[in-house]
Amino acid sequence: MTIIYGQDIGLIHQKLSQIKSNSPYKTIWFKDLKQLYDLFSQPLFGSNNEKFIVNNCSFLEKTSLTRQENLCLEKLKTTDVVLTVYTDNPFSGIKTIKSITTVFCDKLDWKSMHKAIGEVCRELNLKLDLEIIDWLANALPLNMGVIYQEINKLSLLGKNEIKDNKLVETVICDYQPVQIYKLTKALTNSQIVKAFKYIDELASTKPNFATQFLEFFSGELLLALMVKSCNPKQLTNINLNVNQFRLIAIQSQYHNFTSKVLVNIINAIQKLDIKLKHNDGFAIPLLKNFALSFFTN
């Protein structure tokens, strides 16, 4: 028996694709122990004719197993069945059973992104220029499922289209603002510890996030300045090419900031942007110092 585990479901399913390319497997989803008992009770189970992958075996996420669950593992351990568990820390006992092979799908990090993208491209028989691979490594989140989904979209483009950087950028979804939005919200709520955590996380996964963050943040601050004194009716009629509900959310998020403070922060962002361009290696301390200067109670 093989147990494949990890938090990145996309990485697990990439590993399963490799397994299935060498031998046919039938894939099922775990429901309960009875389902597994019924499985190994089948006459052909364990023969060369029938091999199974059982996804999301959630009972293996526990720190200890019941008697029935342990018995189930004992029955399955000498078979070719493959179980998947969507956690980094499954039941520790599986690693002590000699007949069980465990495979850990470690989380992606920025250093492994190029390799991950390359593997997906090979699987999809897709050739991308190094420049586009570099851009994808910075634009996509550390999630193999998302990486596969986005690169699969690129496989639908023509040979000439796939070389058009601007076209590729329009096809790929923009995932960065979601992470950056969490950082801006933490700052405006004076949650400095949380903000520092987001800065560290973004810096570890997106090397040029600081400039993107400042662009996003200054845009929000400008909108906040424009709608600060607007009433709900004015927000409905205002023409800023921005969704009305987003304007309401921005007005609410920045309601404690005076116009003078908003202007001061915008000016500070402009100065910080220049500093970052000249001292890129100091992005994290410069950002944290900026956060402490304006967003502590």
UniProtKB/Swiss-Prot annotation:
Entry GO MF terms: DNA binding; DNA-directed DNA polymerase activity
Keyword Ion transport: no
Superkingdom classification of source: Bacteria
Keywords, ordered alphabetically: DNA replication, DNA-directed DNA polymerase, Nucleotidyltransferase, Transferase
Gene: holA
Record has Transferase as a keyword: yes
Task performed by this protein: Part of the beta sliding clamp loading complex, which hydrolyzes ATP to load the beta clamp onto primed DNA to form the DNA replication pre-initiation complex. DNA polymerase III is a complex, multichain enzyme responsible for most of the replicative synthesis in bacteria. This DNA polymerase also exhibits 3'-5' exonuclease activity. The delta subunit is the wrench that will open the beta subunit dimer.
Name of the protein: Probable DNA polymerase III subunit delta
Record family assignment: Belongs to the DNA polymerase HolA subunit family.
Species of provenance: Mycoplasma genitalium (strain ATCC 33530 / DSM 19775 / NCTC 10195 / G37)
Primary enzyme class: transferase
GO biological process per UniProt: DNA-templated DNA replication
